[in-house]
Amino acid sequence: LRCLVGSEMCIRDRTITGVGHSSHDEVWTAPWGENKRHRNRYNEMSVSVRKPDKSMAFTLRFRAFDDGIAFRYELAQPDSLAVTDELTEFRFANEGHTMSWSIPGNFETYELQYREQPVARITDANTPFTFRTGDGIFGAVHEAALYDWPEMVLRRDSAGVLQADLAPLPDGVKAYIPGRFTTPWRTIQIADRAVGLINSSLVLNLNEPSKIEDPSWIVPQKDVGVWWGMHLGTQVWTMGPRHGATTRNAIRHIDFAAENGIQGVLFEGWNKGWENWGGNQQFDYLEPYADFDLERIAAYAREKGVQLWMHNETGGNILSTKPSWKQR
């Protein structure tokens, strides 16, 4: 467990100034989700560390749950910092006999095909990085409480070890943080069966509680949509013979949603501007393509009791949205 602040190793030449232990056990209720009640039970150890000249101090906090472990840094020093790397490593005892399921490490997308292969063959992976040991134990490497910090992917280093790799800023620095700062949790979930990973509340328990005092106005819903066909290559975003967001296709999806108790239909590629993808990224957020009759589709959806969810892409050009929003 290491990190770099500038060119300085966080834990090199440091002195442990204190070790604390505590336990916690509570049950909390979620307003919605797969499970209503979540048990948050863990044993905790905090290790306080300081440089001899007292210029850098931080705490390493570890938590052991019934179904996994987690750890993070809590920094406390007077000046802001430029974090250049995080060198947290994840080592597997027998990589050749430990199977994994993951997508390739990518800072821009999670819409990739999952791979099933031994850990020994992994060069990079997004998290959650799911694995099964040779003796049948399931696990997953992930993160929790990710605030004001880059996402983590796993990448094999020159020593052959899977190491945390953080998405960089344009200048190459990983994060600019205030002197008092808490990093995300690094998590490892453990289960006898794969379903135990899905049912685990470990990551939820480590995230901050919701700051929404009254969530009654938020209504979870299911949707079907015109978008995945583009990623599969069977449809395209732009108008033409293979256009996905057409009036005919919209009606078909609305009928399916109404017949199966699905509340909404999502449309991607319905508005003009997708032909600019990869160029100036200028989208029109009010004008549909000619083969997408928005008024007819909206009236039909209203008749069927189905909501329309319109995807408005920016392509990273967030400023292009402002003129359109002013027209609404």
Region annotations inferred by a language model:
Residues 27-41:
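Edge strands and adjacent loops of beta-rich recognition modules
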Residues 38-94:
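Acidic, contiguous internal or C-terminal segments within carbohydrate-active enzymes
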Residues 294-298, 303-328:
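Active-site-adjacent "subsite" loops/lids of carbohydrate-active enzymes
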Residues 1-6, 10-11:
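Single conserved hydrophobic/aromatic residue that forms the stacking wall/gate
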Residues 51, 64, 90-303:
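Conserved structural scaffold segments of CAZyme catalytic domains across common CAZy folds
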Residues 5-7, 82, 88, 99-101:
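An acidic-aromatic
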Residues 70-74, 188, 307:
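Residues within well-ordered beta-strands of beta-sheet-rich folds
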